[in-house]
Amino acid sequence: MLFTISYCMDNFLKIYHRSFVLFSVLWLIFPKFSSLLIIWLCLLTIFGAIKKQLVFKPNIALLAMMALFGAYLLSLFTHAAALSSLRFLENKLSLLVIPMLISFYPAKQKELIHLFRAHILGCIVLISIAFYHSYKCSLAFGESLRCFSTTNFSQIHHPSYFSAFLIFSSVVVILDKSNTIVPNKPLRIILFLATLLVQWNLGSLAGFLLIILLVLIVPVLISVFQGGVKNLILSYIILTTIGIGFIFSSEEIKADFSNALSFVKNYNENPEEFIRNRTYPLEGNETRLILWNVSTKICLKHPLGVGLGNLDFHMQKELEALGHSRLALKQNNPHNQFIQITAELGFIGLLLFLSIIIYLLVIASKQKRLILFSLVLSFIVFCLFESMIQRQSGIIFFCFWLAVLSRFNEKNRFAL
């Protein structure tokens, strides 16, 4: 017993860092155990703080994330939320706990490389599991194309969240200029193609749009920030073009883009008529436009927000008034995190949320941090199409990686 305690004391930082590395891979594969994994990290952090192995060093982004949780907590009291709203607060707890943990995290280059590797490994395992599930589905139902797409393919995480995980892996692999994360070049190419081409199976509109934006923006930033990397830019464009060409070879995806553009055009011409004339069953893009319209009205009616846990009631009321009782029964969220936060916490909450994004974009630009910039851009794009911090998958992924990457500084930042 004494030997074990002595060993833990002498090797605390090794145990601590390896626990974070294990967390970054295990929560992806076993999301139901993410709470237990976080509790273990909390216990380690408390132990390290007591023994003065760790020091509390939050930055503006981490404090703002914790403040966002505080705003959600406060809204329960200011808007007289029901006790059932506590379950929504439980989902938001990661907004407090993860930034708090990372505020103690002694970010070092070596350990961060291992975190990146662990995330990539987790994504590869998820891809393997997804193909296994799809294969079993095709054996049972014989519908091979349907079985290998969207929710049939991604059964552990929602396809949009899985898409975000994979794009982050693609970015990490391709922007590893020093070749330290994945030293083997052929393996880097395989990992890049694997994490990129699976986007076809996921069918996430936000994911496709993000890939296009990254193709347009990142090579320019590489030229501005680093210079002299023509081969990197060329290979990046070629590989991504191959990936996008493969993605758009699907008639289903091209039809999805076409329908989305058509719906947006009709909606802009006359929003009220568009909503009234929708017939069931609704397509996904139709549903989004209706939900955005309704939730925006709630934001304007309640500039201070309706509070955490109360939005479903207000959404249902507005949808029923528009003749969409069937949609109201589904209790969908707004499918837009910016609108969701404004509806729940008011415009003050939106400003707090935007402050996190703006701060991270500023430090990414000033410190020439391409991976952080790409992750923030990913967060913005996905938040435009999904309420990304409503589920644990989105909260943990973005909170963890935005928090970790925000802890870099010019002295110990990873050379990317």
Outline where the language-model segments fall.
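Transmembrane signal-anchor hairpin modules in multi-pass inner-membrane enzymes, especially those
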Residues: 1-87, 107-113, 117, 176-186, ...
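Alpha-helical transmembrane segments of multi-pass inner-membrane proteins
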Residues: 23-24, 113-144, 154-226, 236, ...
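Membrane-interface micro-motifs in multi-pass membrane enzymes
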Residues: 29-38, 87-91, 153-167, 206, ...
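Hydrophobic cores of alpha-helical transmembrane segments in multi-pass inner/ER membrane proteins
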Residues: 40-42, 95-103, 161-175, 399-405
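Transmembrane alpha-helices of multi-pass inner-membrane enzymes
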Residues: 41-45, 171, 211, 215-216, ...
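Hydrophobic transmembrane alpha-helices and their immediate junctions
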Residues: 50, 220, 229, 321, ...
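A membrane-periplasm/extracellular boundary helix in multi-pass inner-membrane enzymes
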Residues: 222-279, 291-300
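Long extracytoplasmic/lumenal interhelical loops at the membrane interface
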Residues: 278-345
